[in-house]
Structures are given as structure tokens and as C-alpha cells.
Amino acid sequence: MALTKADLAENLFEKLGFSKRDAKDTVEVFFEEIRKALENGEQVKLSGFGNFDLRDKNERPGRNPKTGEDIPITARRVVTFRPGQKLKARVENLK
């Protein structure tokens, strides 16, 4: 099961006593701030959680899996996430 933005808002409502509207707005603002920072080329560092970075990927050769035809994969910018040590440690101990 995946954790959704609606789940995050529900947790804020239940655990912190936010109104449902405020909880939803808080989650939306949080993710909008991350989006804006990345759109402006900034790194996003969430202490104890991890970092979101932008990485430029060069053009590279690819292949159409149906036809086998060689096609170029265009250069692009991608978002990467590197988990922090605390998050890694907690996840590694789960089984």
C-alpha cells in the first residue's frame, strides 16, 4: 500500500489536531515548496530524511524494444533522491 497526500493530511488531522482543510492545505504547501525549489534548480535538503537533487543526463543511444531500431534518447534533467543516514538505518532494519 502506498502513502498518499490524503493519508498525510489525515495524519495531521488525527495526530496534531489540524482541521481537515488546514491539514490538506499544509500538505499541498509543503509539496509546492519542494516543487518550486527544484524548478529553480535548488537542492532540497530534509534533515534526517534525505536530499532531492537535479541531475542532467546526456543524450545516449537507445533501442526501440518492438522494432530493434536504434533511436537516440534525448538529454534531460531528472530529479534524484538520496536518503539520509537516519532514514537508511531505519529502513535497513525492516524485514
From Swiss-Prot:
Q: Which GO terms describe its biological process?
A: DNA recombination; positive regulation of metabolic process; regulation of DNA-templated transcription; regulation of translation
Q: Which Pfam families match?
A: Bac_DNA_binding
Instruction: For this UniProt record, give its keywords in alphabetical order, as a comma-separated list.
Output: DNA recombination, DNA-binding, Transcription, Transcription regulation, Translation regulation
Xref: CDD domains = IHF_A (cd13835)
Q: Which domain of life is it from?
A: Bacteria
Q: Where is this region: Disordered?
A: 51-71
- What Gene Ontology cellular component terms go with this record? cytosol
Q: Which PROSITE patterns match?
A: HISTONE_LIKE
Q: Does Hydrolase count among this protein's keywords?
A: no
Enumerate composition-biased segments (Basic and acidic residues). 53-69
Any one GO molecular-function label of the UniProt entry: structural constituent of chromatin
The text of the family note is: Belongs to the bacterial histone-like protein family.
Q: How does it assemble?
A: Heterodimer of an alpha and a beta chain.
HAMAP family with a match to the protein in the record? IHF_alpha
Q: What job does the chain carry out?
A: This protein is one of the two subunits of integration host factor, a specific DNA-binding protein that functions in genetic recombination as well as in transcriptional and translational control.
- The molecule here is called Integration host factor subunit alpha
In its UniProt entry, the species of origin is given as: Vibrio vulnificus (strain YJ016)
